[in-house]
Amino acid sequence: RHEFNAENIKPRDLYETYLPPFEALVKEGKVKEVMCAYNRFEGDPCCGSDRLLMQILRDEWGFDGIVLSDCGAIADFYRDYGHKTHPDAESASAAAVLSGTDLECGSSYEALVEAVKQGKIDEKAVDVAVKRLLTARFALGEMDEPEKVSWTGIPFSVVASAGHDSLALDMARKSMTLLMNKDNTLPLKRGGLTIAVMGPNANDSVMQWGNYNGMPPHTVTILDGIRKALGSDDRLIYEPVSYTHLRAHE
């Protein structure tokens, strides 16, 4: 993902296969922040792609919010194990901002001061990104007293309500796509099943949260979820050892 170049994508495939989910989120969901990806698109890193971030996202779809890079994506522009499309952090940061990436998850944008001094980007272009960022922070109420911001007082009981749990479950179910069902394997026949569950993460609740997350009131592990779904005459075999990890160190 840090070196891959998605290229020679036909316009019809782009607009009918890849873009519709994102377009719906922008136009119908009214999202205020979009994250640009690690990989390249037709030779340009996604976070430095005028085609994606300016022409399509902002001009065609009318997006006026913030574009944030995935973590370390700007450094991929110039580091050896990345795309190597730019010689240094100054060039990479300037290109990203000029292409519409307002905020970086990382430290490459620290080079923007030097990039301005070197003439690689005008200070007015940086101001455009800063204005978008400050507009969002004001809209979130970050500059107001907490008691004046309506959503700072929402209790956890509302956030983790039964209605929200039900909605999250429904969204998860509808997000799944079955690409192939060889030999009609699914749905699994109930009764007399033997299920093997492999790896330590199957029984690790914290792993499921991700690395920037809220604190859920409870977590059902993958292993517990499978156990709950099985019948009394089904058999479950759980092996917590990570065989991939072992092979990597042999």
Question: What would you call each of these model-derived segments?
Answer:
Residues R1-R247:
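Glycoside hydrolase catalytic-domain context in secreted enzymes
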